[in-house]
Amino acid sequence: QQIDDLIDLVVEVGHGSNFHILPCNGTEYIFYDDAGVRNEIVPDNMELNLGAEVFSELMAVLSNLQAEVAGDFWRQGLPLTGNFIQYRGSMINWCPIGRNAEGIQRTKFVEHDTETGFRKKHHKTLNEWVQWRKIPLTVALGGSTSFDIYPTGWDKTYCLTWFGDFTCWFVGDACHE
């Protein structure tokens, strides 16, 4: 699916036969040129960086938080769509309503978040846990519905480590922040 999406993007953007994209905070490199679509993984990996035990503990903390909020969301009529915690190699994305949520569902969550401060509260909770455990992680609000958790320094600009001499465009629904 990712390769098909890249081909569609190449056609839409109009860069012809030379297009490079760095999803996953720059730890994955997909490019399209005369030889076709190719994919390389940069040798950085969050699970290896943290260690299996700490990584598993983080996943357990997120799973417990998801279980807590799922009941509240269900009682309040908020959407739950599936694919709540996604490991992307360089980061974990936690989306309490689910990555599969579509427009109206996302809008409903954003309204709830604006009214209740849901993400601010859970951002604080996760940051307190990270500080208590003394783990070098950054917890950031990811777009309008999720949280991005990654090793400190591995934000979207991390790709500049590998491609600092190139023009890089950063995309996402909250890049203005």
Put a short name on every predicted segment.
Residues 1-83:
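Active-site phosphate-binding/coordination module
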Residues 3-4, 156-157, 177:
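Short, well-ordered alpha-helical microsegments
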Residues 11-15, 161, 168, 175-177:
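Catalytic phosphate/metal-binding cores of nucleic-acid and nucleotide-processing enzymes, i.e., regions
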Residues 22, 169-171:
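Hydrophobic/aromatic beta-strand patches that form the interior of the parallel beta-sheet core
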Residues 26, 98-101, 175:
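Short, glycine/serine-rich, charged loops/turns that create anion-binding
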Residues 28, 155, 174:
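Gly/Ser/Thr-rich beta-alpha loop segments that engage phosphate groups in nucleotides
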Residues 74-169:
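Conserved acidic, metal-coordinating active-site core of Asp-based
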